[in-house]
From Swiss-Prot:
Main subcellular location of this protein, as a coarse class: mitochondrion
Protein name according to UniProt: Mitochondrial genome maintenance protein MGM101
Any one Gene Ontology molecular-function term assigned to this protein's record: DNA binding
Protein location: Mitochondrion matrix, Mitochondrion nucleoid
Functional summary from the UniProt entry: Performs an essential function in the repair of oxidatively damaged mtDNA that is required for the maintenance of the mitochondrial genome. Binds to DNA.
Biological process annotations from GO: DNA repair; interstrand cross-link repair; mitochondrial genome maintenance; recombinational repair
Record family assignment: Belongs to the MGM101 family.
GO cellular component: mitochondrial chromosome; mitochondrial nucleoid; mitochondrion
Originating gene: MGM101
Keyword Ribonucleoprotein among UniProt keywords: no
Transit peptide, residue positions per record: 1-30
The entry's keywords: DNA damage, DNA repair, DNA-binding, Mitochondrion, Mitochondrion nucleoid, Transit peptide
Domain of life: Eukaryota
Amino acid sequence: MKSIFKVRGCVSHAAQFCQKRTVVSTGTSNTATAGAVRKSFNSTETKPVFATKSEAGNGSHMKEYSSGINSKLGGTPLETRSTADDSLNNSYKQVKGDIDWYTSWYGLGMKPFEAKVQKDLIEPLDPKDIEIKPDGLIYLPEIKYRRILNKAFGAGGWGLVPRSQTIVTSKLVTREYGLICHGQLISVARGEQDYFNEAGIPTATEGCKSNALMRCCKDLGVGSELWDPVFIKKFKVDHCTEKFVEHVTTKRKKKIWLRKDRQVEYPYK
């Protein structure tokens, strides 16, 4: 009798083990996540499994991704487009008449803005707001673009929407954005930002967005003088100077540009 109970216990234990074991199968649907899908016999839930390093290196579309990113993301883009099925835990519902700014070109070139708005947009820049890089490139800080847009359209009257996935290569983050003002698509531009290690990717995505905003503002005439060769030369003569400096650590000497009202800063002296 004891031996019979022992055999039944072993059979029951084996059955439980078989129910809990998992298998790995490849997805066949076009909408499936890249890589294998892990399925459980006692559950209908499926979870994506990231590709291994060897799998990630096989695809030609993954060659531009760094090996570290491949191991974590399976060679997929950093971000993907949200849909009505996965946005905000399925709380989003498509409303008739909604505009999908990811693909729509609604309002582009449809009508001009009011005269006051146009005046605020093309207002000449204050020389005090313009900065210059050590290599001589003049630019307007990104926050100044936002202030100009807020002044012209009002806070909440404009926005920047993604128009593509975020692409991460071994050294660069890039994504396409569209500028929406008062319900109209104004401009589309691709932002880009370099990064030096994978820890800097989140910061690079924000820099990519800022770069796209600056490029979109060119179509509104914001800071248009920054691309005018005559203005650039005059600004450098009136407000900037060149100085020979020495790098604190490498001891190398070079000539850099800086504003006349600024002092040489670290790492130069």
